């Protein structure tokens, strides 16, 4: 009874914890989504000439042209605009690009009106249809799509050559827009042999997991990620030389934040892949005029975001050059201004000699007279338009008068030298207005025109203000803000994105900006504006301290308060005067674990299953001639009672020690499969920068990892208890159905005078009709089906066998002892022991099948749509044959021999450790560990003089 209570208690705790995490994830601290939906008419046309003659995947995929029009696109297609090609993501569709085509056409029409007849810039939006393929689950599918993308780009560029129009430049490159895994396909494409050099120079990705695959259930996809990321790092390590094939490529990565429940937004970072000269990572919360979290699908149709992307496209294109885009520096400057959500400077410098500049004074809602003004270490907030560069800027900021602002390096008398124009931080105002904020730690120069002076627009000016908070997780801290513009509060101690916080406000605090420090090693722009709701705002951030995400190695720096403040991962910029109180939101923090550790809910329970199985075999081997195999219920209860606390200490210690380099060296040295280098956690990247990441266990170390590790292990143990009960319930119901349906059949009747006999011909036992089925399945694996399907069928077969054995035992137990199938108590115990063994294997195989389902889903989808997909699991008979033979062997009720128990211990022990330490990043190995175990148990059970019950053998 106590064992049942222990199991039940752990199961109830597990259910409660999972529900709490889910409620926290779904309901606590959600990003506010304020996306607008804009309807537009689109027309599509199949690019008919692009067939199997131009790509070996011409019959599998297709290419289309998308236009914002109510009229059909005439054939043959004659493109004439700037080429943009869209690559949809996992199970996506080619029509998703329609809203972008619509907003680009709308923006172009309005700019024509603004410029009074200028021809404007036309775009040709091409889109690839991958037939909703599951590219996130299968590496081979990812490679196929990348190869097809290169073929499509080459064909598109050739179309422009064939249809060249007088006065138009023939494009030699395209802009690629990728959603989700489409962004990864775009990065893979430039690494393949069929990539046409310089045919891609700008890539924009939306919610794309660049660093780590969202699911690691397929070995190929982890290998593709590893090779592609290594290629990009090695290329940029060459700098701007001709040895770098990617030197002219700029890439923008945009994430949706917490609202994206499909891809962890930590994985969008390009920090360790691309230098700042070529790449930018940001969040939709950070982007001016967007300022909202966006879910995984809405990122393609959110009106505010697609408007900003379309505006940026108009900024970076130049139809008069073959590349169709402006130089790399201009493109990156545009990306920073449009998407970083931060203040930036122009690259050009100018001097102001002998000008009459008036010192600025602190004050609110000032109306300045025409002329130059200057100040030092100032910040300003205004509704003026600051430093617009083009008609596109003017279109975006239709209200407000122009104000010119510079940051200067030096001042000598009335001269200001080495001045750069400031592009301000945009701040949301009331009634959908947009304000401009400028902060300068140095010399600020301001030029107020007569028009600006007479416009009635206002300026708030005050000194810059920054303070650091010595915060810890055990309490809260209260700050008073008195600055007339804003006050910056840094939190150097809050370094983990796994923890969420809550801020209570009072007084006149009307807006809080959360952002990362300007000098923080991370270059991912994660900021958001928070409006207090019932005097409260919720704080959470990505990137810093995220599991498995590479981070820059620390270099010796000053440790004074000012340096710590600027490098703090979390800053709060408080607009208004009042009090703010920050504290940890423990319930809200639980939801952060779900997105980061979904795969762990598969790998860690597998480790627990192998630990329990090790305990079962240890008891079985130590019990002598009267060997009894413990039931999974009993073994799990024993594990919880006697070993779980020790196991929690072990995993807590593992989480702590992996922060040491020599420990990680050793763990990578003993890893199966080998990573190729014991220094795999070190990432040598561009310009000598060195990044590192912890790719073991929880992907983090330190106090948070030490706390989370035991909690996750206890949760995994509870999952094993719950799954065990579910499998037992299923087999019990099936056995009841078998008993009722075959009650009168001779198979379940008890023959008299049956004795236990010995099988002297195990080879002959294999000459069984199920052997034909196994041979057929093996042939199909060699020729056509993936081994995951064969494994799933074997699992179903074992469940049926277990149910049959249970039904048979129940039927025999209902007879008197004199007519029992078993002549003595020892035989009954052996049968019960075997059923325990079969039930345990059923649970392990069911759990392993869950890991195989994603790859199996790719194959099933291909069959449904009539597409052939190459699988590495095709022809891989060794990955499932031991399991098939193991199931066949179980049908003869063979138990493992007691010889060589240490081999069983080693296999189970290392499988348990492997699933614990490497399971998150190598979940595909879960299948192979069971297959290895099945092969070994098959060998140990094939011994001469093995006891079986021949009359009960299942035909």
Swiss-Prot record:
Domain of life: Eukaryota
Topology of the protein relative to the lipid bilayer: Multi-pass membrane protein
GO CC aspect terms: endoplasmic reticulum; endoplasmic reticulum membrane
Listed SUPFAM superfamilies: alpha/beta-Hydrolases (SSF53474)
Enzyme Commission no: 3.1.-.-
UniProt-annotated location(s): Endoplasmic reticulum membrane
InterPro entries: AB_hydrolase_fold (IPR029058), PGAP1-ab_dom-like (IPR012908), PGAP1/BST1 (IPR039529), PGAP1_TMD (IPR056824)
GO biological process, one term: GPI anchor biosynthetic process
Enzyme class: hydrolase
Sugar-bearing residue positions: 7, 431, 753, 914, 945
Active site (record annotation): 180
Record field: transmembrane: 8-28, 489-509, 600-620, 643-663, 703-723, 772-792, 840-860, 870-890, 919-939
Record Pfam families: PGAP1 (PF07819), PGAP1_TMD (PF25140)
GO molecular-function terms, A-Z: phosphatidylinositol deacylase activity
Keywords: Endoplasmic reticulum, Glycoprotein, Hydrolase, Membrane, Protein transport, Transmembrane, Transmembrane helix, Transport
Keyword rRNA-binding assigned: no
Function in brief: Involved in inositol deacylation of GPI-anchored proteins which plays important roles in the quality control and ER-associated degradation of GPI-anchored proteins.
Matching PANTHER family: GPI INOSITOL-DEACYLASE, NEGATIVE REGULATOR OF VESICLE FORMATION-RELATED
Similarity comment: family membership: Belongs to the GPI inositol-deacylase family.
Stated name of the protein: GPI inositol-deacylase B
Organism classification: Eukaryota, Fungi, Dikarya, Ascomycota, Saccharomycotina
Gene name for this UniProt entry: BST1B
């Amino acid at each position: 009874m106590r064992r049942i209570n222990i199991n039940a208690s752990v199961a109830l705790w597990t259910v409660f914890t999972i529900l709490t995490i889910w409620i926290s994830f779904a309901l606590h601290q959600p990003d506010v989504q304020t996306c607008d939906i804009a309807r537009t008419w689109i027309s599509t046309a199949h690019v008919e000439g692009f067939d199997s003659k131009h790509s070996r995947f011409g019959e599998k995929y297709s290419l289309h042209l998308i236009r914002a029009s109510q009229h059909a696109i005439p054939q043959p297609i004659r493109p004439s605009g700037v080429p943009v090609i869209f690559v949809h993501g996992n199970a996506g569709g080619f029509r998703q690009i329609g809203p972008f085509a619509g907003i680009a056409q709308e923006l172009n029409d309005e700019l024509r009106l603004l410029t009074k007849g200028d021809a404007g810039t036309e775009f040709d939006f091409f889109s690839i249809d991958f037939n909703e393929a599951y590219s996130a689950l299968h590496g081979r599918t990812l490679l196929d799509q990348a190869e097809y993308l290169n073929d499509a780009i080459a064909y598109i560029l050739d179309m422009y050559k064939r249809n060249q129009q007088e006065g138009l430049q023939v494009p030699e490159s395209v802009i690629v827009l990728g959603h989700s895994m489409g962004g990864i396909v775009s990065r893979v494409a430039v690494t393949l042999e069929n990539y046409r050099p310089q045919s891609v120079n700008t890539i924009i990705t939306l919610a794309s997991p660049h660093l780590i695959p969202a699911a690691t259930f397929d070995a190929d996809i982890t290998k593709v990620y590893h090779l592609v990321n290594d290629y990009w790092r090695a290329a940029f390590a060459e700098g701007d030389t001709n040895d770098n094939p990617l030197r002219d490529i700029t890439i923008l990565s945009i994430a949706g934040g917490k609202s994206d429940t499909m891809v962890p937004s930590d994985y969008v970072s390009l920090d360790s892949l691309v230098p700042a000269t070529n790449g930018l990572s940001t969040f939709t919360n950070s982007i001016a005029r967007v300022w909202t979290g966006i879910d995984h699908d809405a990122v393609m149709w959110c009106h505010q975001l697609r408007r900003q992307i379309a505006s940026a496209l108009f900024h970076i294109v130049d139809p008069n050059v073959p590349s169709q885009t402006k130089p790399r520096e201009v493109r990156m400057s545009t990306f920073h201004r449009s998407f970083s959500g931060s203040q930036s400077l122009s690259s050009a410098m100018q001097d102001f000699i002998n000008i009459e500049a008036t010192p600025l004074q602190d004050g609110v809602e000032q109306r300045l007279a025409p002329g130059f003004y200057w100040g030092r270490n100032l910040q300003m907030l205004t509704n003026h338009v600051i430093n617009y560069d083009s008609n596109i800027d003017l279109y975006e900021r239709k209200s407000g008068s122009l104000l010119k602002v510079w940051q200067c390096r030096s001042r000598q008398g009335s001269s200001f030298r080495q001045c750069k124009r400031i592009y301000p931080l945009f701040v949301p105002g009331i009634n959908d207005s947009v304000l401009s904020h400028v902060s300068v730690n140095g010399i600020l120069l301001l030029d107020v025109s007569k028009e600006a002076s007479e416009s009635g627009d206002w300026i708030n000016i005050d000194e810059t203000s920054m303070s650091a908070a010595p915060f810890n997780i055990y309490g809260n801290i209260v700050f008073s803000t008195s600055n007339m513009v804003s006050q910056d509060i840094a939190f150097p101690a809050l370094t983990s994105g796994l923890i969420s916080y809550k801020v209570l406000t009072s007084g006149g605090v009307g807006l809080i900006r959360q952002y990362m420090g300007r000098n923080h090693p991370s270059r991912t722009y994660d900021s958001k504006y928070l409006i207090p709701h019932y005097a409260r705002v919720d704080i959470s951030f990505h990137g810093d301290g995220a599991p498995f995400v590479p981070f820059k190695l620390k270099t010796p720096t000053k440790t004074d308060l000012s340096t710590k403040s600027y490098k703090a991962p979390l800053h709060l910029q408080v607009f208004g005067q009042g009090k703010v109180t920050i504290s940890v939101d423990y319930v809200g923090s639980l939801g952060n674990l779900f997105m980061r550790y979904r795969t762990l809910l598969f790998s860690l329970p597998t480790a627990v299953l192998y630990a329990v199985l090790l305990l079962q075999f240890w008891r079985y081997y130590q019990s002598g001639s009267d060997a009894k195999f413990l039931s999974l219920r009993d073994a799990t209860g024993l594990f919880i009672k006697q070993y779980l606390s020790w196991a929690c200490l072990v995993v807590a210690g593992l989480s702590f020690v992996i922060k040491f380099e020599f420990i990680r060296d050793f763990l990578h040295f003993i890893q199966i499969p080998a990573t190729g280098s014991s220094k795999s956690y070190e990432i040598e990247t561009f310009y000598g920068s060195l990044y590192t990441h912890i790719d073991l266990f929880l992907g983090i170390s330190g106090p948070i990892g030490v706390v989370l590790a035991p909690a996750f292990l206890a949760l995994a143990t509870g999952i094993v208890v719950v799954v065990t009960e579910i499998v037992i319930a299923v087999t019990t119901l099936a056995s009841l159905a078998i008993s009722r349906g075959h009650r009168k059949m001779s198979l379940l009747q008890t023959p008299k005078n049956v004795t236990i006999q010995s099988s002297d011909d195990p080879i002959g036992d294999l000459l069984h009709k199920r052997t034909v089925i196994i041979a057929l399945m093996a042939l199909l694996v060699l020729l056509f089906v993936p081994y995951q399907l064969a494994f799933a069928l074997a699992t179903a077969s074992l469940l049926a066998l277990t149910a049959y054995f249970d039904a048979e035992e129940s039927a025999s137990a209902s007879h008197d002892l004199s007519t029992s199938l078993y002549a003595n108590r020892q035989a009954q115990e052996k049968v019960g022991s075997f059923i325990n063994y079969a039930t345990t294997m059923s649970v392990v195989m069911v759990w392993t099948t869950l890991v195989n389902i994603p790859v199996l889903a790719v194959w099933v989808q291909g069959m449904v749509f009539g597409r052939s997909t190459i699988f590495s699991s095709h022809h891989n008979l060794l990955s499932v044959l031991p399991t098939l033979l193991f199931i066949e062997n179980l049908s003869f009720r063979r138990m493992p021999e007691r010889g060589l128990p240490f081999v069983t211990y080693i296999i189970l022990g290392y499988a348990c450790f492997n699933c614990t330490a490497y399971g998150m990043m190598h979940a595909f190995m879960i299948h192979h560990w069971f297959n290895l175990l099945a092969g070994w148990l098959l060998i140990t059970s094939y011994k001469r003089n093995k006891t079986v019950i021949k009359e009960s053998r299942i035909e």
